[in-house]
Amino acid sequence: PIQMASQTWDDHDRSDRYLARDFGQNYLMSLQETGNPIIFTNGDNDTFPLWYNQETEGFRTDARTCNLSYLQTDWYIDQMKRPAYDSPSLPITWDRMEYVEGTNEYIPVQPDYKKSIDALYAEAEKQALNGNPEALVNVKKEFGENPYELQNILKYWVRSKNDDLKVIPTDSIVMKVDKEAVRRSGMMIPGDSIPDYMHISLKGKRALYKSELMMLEMLAEANWERPIYMAVSVGTENHLGMGNHFVQEGLTYRFTPFDTEKTGVKLDSEKMYDNLMNKFKFGGIDKEGIYIDENAMRM
């Protein structure tokens, strides 16, 4: 035991090192100060330090930490639909029976439906031109103005009472952009224009799971009025094909309607500089003699 203690003491010496707490604060400090932001996390190391800071130190209680691993469960969605401290409930409109365990665990992505839907709308438009406008009105009443728009897919397909319609009928979803909401949001606007639509690619995905459906629900319902972020530590497999719409502002990626592959702007340099130089804490690792283990180095 003496040999073990003498040879490995430094490996276990955490004195004056507050990296876990400070990095939790850094994630939260990366969020916009207004608007009750939401941050999606996924693992232990990017969730529990945030919860500690909010629950114990009362730090950024206006923000909501949402763990994607738990978002697959009904009890956690229940929690997210309730206010917590200074954070209002998350923008989820589903009734409990729509997400209770065993319901809507996943929804198949079936882009082969698109051909039939396009034909249905084309025929209805043809009938409308030939003096039967009710045909087009009825089709739009059943599937919406644009059947591939995010809110219509959630309303008329995913949440349909008809089990035959519980599919996502395209692998390319569009979301109409409220430009005034984007201008008010506080996000960086590259260039001088805001796109009319945001495009979400589901190519290669066979289904969307409940947690992913909840992400889309929140994105649609927040409508850029409430900032939504993804922790940088969340793997790309959980980005739901929206990585090209992320702009980094610190230890977080912000969801934006801009395609960064087209704008070339993937980083808000002003916010990043302010966070790194003026806000972030580094848990004492800048002090001489502090032991930095492999986990700290990775962070």
Regions inferred by a protein language model and the residue ranges of each:
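ER/secretory pathway lumenal C-terminal domains and tails of membrane proteins involved
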Residues: P1-N36, N53-M299
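Phosphate- and divalent-cation-binding pockets in alpha/beta enzyme and binding domains
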Residues: F48-Y52
